[in-house]
Amino acid sequence: MPVELLNIEGLWVRYNAAEVLRQISFRVAAGDYVGIVGPNGSGKSTLIKAALGLVGGERGNVALFGTPLASFTEWRRIGYLPQRLRFFNPNFPATVEEIVGLGLLAGKQLPRKLTREDRQAVEKTLEFMGITDLRKRIIGELSGGQQQRVLLARSIVGGPELLILDEPTTALDPETRDKFYTLLRDLNRDKGITVILVTHDTSSIGTYASRFIYVDKEIIFNGTFDDFCHSTEMTNLFGEYAQHLICHRH
């Protein structure tokens, strides 16, 4: 039976008096590739932040790797690429390999130099991501797609078992976005990394994710994308014409 990496039960979140999430429950097992989809303002990003303890829930329970969130300390097992992470100023004096190396310092006392083993891990990650030739470049000089590859490399260099990404393709053109999604699928299939991907891109995620969760303050649907395409929830959300357009790609 697959190991359970994330378990959320009955999660409610409020900001001041506003209800952001209500009665959220789902589980993620080792090897899953889960796409969490919903419109702007649906609470997708808040859900991820609550799962990582960055936002407090009004009630409900969250467990990571079988450990209650309040007691969890093994953060090296998780790679996280938040929605807004900016190293993109051309004057920011950090190279690609330095940015990737930062991913090995999570939970470490700073300042700390990278060990030889750390540098080898950075080298292997740069090679896997296809960005070895960029190692000495300043990250702010790179294209949006290259920057996202670097930030993804930073998230996986420590060898996480669970990778969580919040809207990582928002600024990318469609071709670069699809390449990025394919790369995530390779990480899931070839390296065995469990992936949770938050996006508003309903149509594309169906090609890549093995599980599909549609959120709009509460969970509207949790299952495969194919089942979603044939569900009344899909018809109610998008209408028959949009349903055909979204699902026809698959």
Each language-model region and where it sits:
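H-loop (His-switch) and adjacent beta-strand-loop-beta switch element
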Residues: 212-224
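Catalytic Walker B motif of ABC-type/P-loop ATPase nucleotide-binding domains
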Residues: 163-166
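Conserved ABC transporter NBD signature motif
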Residues: 60-74
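Conserved catalytic motifs of ABC-family nucleotide-binding domains
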Residues: 159
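Helix-to-loop junction immediately C-terminal to a conserved catalytic motif
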Residues: 52
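Conserved ABC ATPase signature
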Residues: 138-142, 146
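Conserved ABC ATPase "signature" region
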Residues: 101, 115-134
